Structures are given as C-alpha cells and as structure tokens.
Regions:
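Structured, contiguous alpha/beta core segments that scaffold functional sites
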Residues: 1-236, 241-242, 246-249, 253, ...
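Divalent metal-cofactor coordination and adjacent catalytic microenvironments
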Residues: 72, 82-90, 277-305, 315
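General structural feature for long, well-ordered alpha-helical segments within catalytic domains
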Residues: 193, 197, 201, 243-244, ...
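Alpha-helix capping/termination and helix-coil
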Residues: 205, 209, 251-255, 281-293
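Charged substrate- and nucleic-acid-binding regions of tRNA-handling and nucleotidyl-transfer enzymes
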Residues: 306-338
C-alpha cells in the first residue's frame, strides 16, 4: 500500500462541461442517476456489527429511505451521490453520528496508511475526517486501490469529437454560412480597396441574415470558389450518431432507449439496462452502507416495471419451495420483500 495522498486522478471539470453542454451526455447521465436514485432500499438485521455501533434499525431506515439530513430529501441526496459516482468515480458520505452528508468527491483527498489501509480523509485541504466518519464508494479502477475512475473517461475521445463537430457547425453559421470564395481582378487593387470590397461582401451577402443579395462585379472581375462545400456533409449526421452511440455504450444505456418511434426490442433492452447498469450501482452503494452500519441494505425491485418478469419467476420459485415444505410462507414473504 502506498503512502501518497490520493486525490482525483482526473480533472473532472472537463467531464462536468461535457455533462452540461452535450445533450446526449446530459440525457444519458440523468437517466442513470434518476433511475438508480428511485430504487427503494430495504433495511434488515444482519449477523455482524458495523463500523459504527449502537444505532437502531429504525434510525438507519429513516436515514436511508426518507431523510438523510435535515436539509435534503432522500431523492436529492441519492442523485448527488450518483452524479459524483459517474463524473468522478467516487462517492464520499460523512456521518456525524446523527445525519448523512454528501462530500463532493473532487474536493476529498485520501490519506493512505500501510497498516490500516486509510489513515484519514481531507476535505478542501483543510478539514480532516477519520475513517470511522466517512463512507467511501469506489468505482472500478486499474490504477488505484483507493480511488475509482470516472465512467466518462472511456468516452472522452467520442465526447471531444462531438464537441469539435458542434463547434465547427456553430462557427460556420456564425461566420455567415458563406463558402470560401475568390474575386478575380484583371488589375492590381490597393489594400484599402481590398478591405472595402471584403467588408461590402460580408455585409451584403449573408444567407443567415435573410437571403442572398445579388452583387454586380464590373471591371472584368470574376467570381470563383476555393472550396466545394456540401451543406449536407456539414451536418456530420453519421459521425455524430456514431459518437453518441459510443457514449451511450460507455454509460451502459442501450441506444435503442433513446431512439424515437416504436421499438419491438425496447422491453428486453430496458430489462438489461436495469440488470447491467442501474442495479450494480445501487448494489455498490448498498454494500458500503451495509458494512458501515451493520444492517443488511438491499434494493427493493418490486416497483420497477422492467423487472416484473423476474418477480414472477421469483414468486413461482418460492411458491415451489413453500409447497415442498423446504421453507415457510413467512420466509418466502421475507425473501420477496413482502
């Protein structure tokens, strides 16, 4: 175990910019965040003690399902946590003995220890916390056993390309949407007159200002184009679509879920999205909370429409066990969260 202070490996500001400015990133991240935050939590007794002692189950249940602190509801609290998880790759929660508070991950440094794994946490380089006050949820990472890596890192190339394509389109139309042109003159023109002609062209010939006004070229002047611009190619439609699909794949959102129209395969993709993207995030958070508080924290999927077939299969399975006398009806109800 190393002893160097572990801060954010990535400059998360670029990911925050992509999240705020790119429609596909904003929509996909919000889908994962909102869907993960709406998965209900069930708190049950478990056969081991947690990091903190002496807290009753009713208190933990209230913190994790209703009011984590006096200032936030559970939905807002969870959404803040999961946004940090996707953007930074880490979640830090401070427990003061009464309430839970979210610490923005990019402000938190981890101080490793060769014997106890973590010596402490520092917030904004000035506020110190001991490991018994912090719940840390880490995203997968190859480079560090302490900090996770942002999910958006793998999509950085696609997001950068998408941004540059959009900027090119914006600049093209901002500059008048005029292809490169050359006016040929049979005689030498002074620099002053050249500038006047350029300004006259920019003022009169602006398609973005309401149309093309005809120009009269006299004195033997000719008009020629230096670039063959295909306006359809400027849409970058196929390239944009390809980049968007790559971003969705990195975030674990099936592209079909954002396509318009009726899709016959939407149901299995919706199910796969919950099983492979949403529930793994929820489980990682729950396992960290379970270790910290010493209570079993499990997701309640009974109200998730995409997972109703799994509930039917589970109900049939437990009914078979009850009918065979292997478990009691009460044990089956508990397993099904009823």
């Amino acid at each position: 175990l190393g002893q160097n202070v572990e801060g954010s490996r990535e400059f998360t500001g670029q990911y925050e910019t992509y999240y705020e400015n790119l429609e596909i990133v904003n929509r996909a991240v919000n889908m994962v965040v909102d869907d993960s935050a709406t998965v209900n939590t069930t708190v049950k007794p478990v056969g081991h003690s947690g990091v903190v002692k002496g807290i009753k189950r009713a208190k933990i249940e209230n913190l994790l399902t209703k009011e984590p602190n006096p200032f936030q509801d559970i939905s807002t609290f969870k959404r803040n946590l999961i946004i940090d998880y996707i953007i930074d790759g880490n979640i830090f929660i401070y427990f003061d003995g009464i309430s839970l508070y979210h610490l923005p991950a990019h402000y938190v440094d981890i101080e490793p220890d060769t014997k106890t794994y973590v010596q402490g946490y520092t917030f904004q380089t000035s506020i110190d916390y001991n490991p018994r006050e912090i719940i840390h949820i880490k995203e997968n990472s190859f480079h560090s056993i302490y900090r996770g890596t942002s999910r958006l890192k793998a999509a950085q190339r696609s997001m950068s390309q998408l941004t540059r394509m959009r900027e090119f389109q914006d600049n093209f139309f901002k500059n008048g949407a005029v292809p490169g042109l050359v006016i040929k003159s049979p005689s030498v023109i002074s620099e002053k007159n050249k500038e006047r002609m350029i300004q006259s062209w920019m003022t009169r010939y602006r398609p973005d200002g309401g149309g093309r006004r005809p120009l009269v070229l006299d004195g033997g002047m000719e008009l020629d184009a230096i670039s063959n611009v295909n306006f359809r190619e400027l849409d970058f439609e196929s390239s944009i679509e390809s980049s968007e699909k790559e971003i969705l794949k990195v975030l674990g959102v099936p592209p079909i879920m954002l396509d318009s129209g009726n899709n016959a395969n939407i149901r299995p993709n919706h199910r796969m999205y919950y099983l492979e993207t949403v529930l793994p995030i929820v489980e990682k958070i729950n396992r960290a909370l379970e270790r910290f508080f010493g209570f079993a924290v499990t997701p309640d999927i009974s109200n998730i429409p995409a997972l109703q077939p799994e509930l039917r299969d589970s109900a049939a399975y437990y009914s078979t066990l009850v009918n065979a006398g292997i478990i009691t009806p009460n044990e089956a109800r508990e397993a099904l969260n009823y």
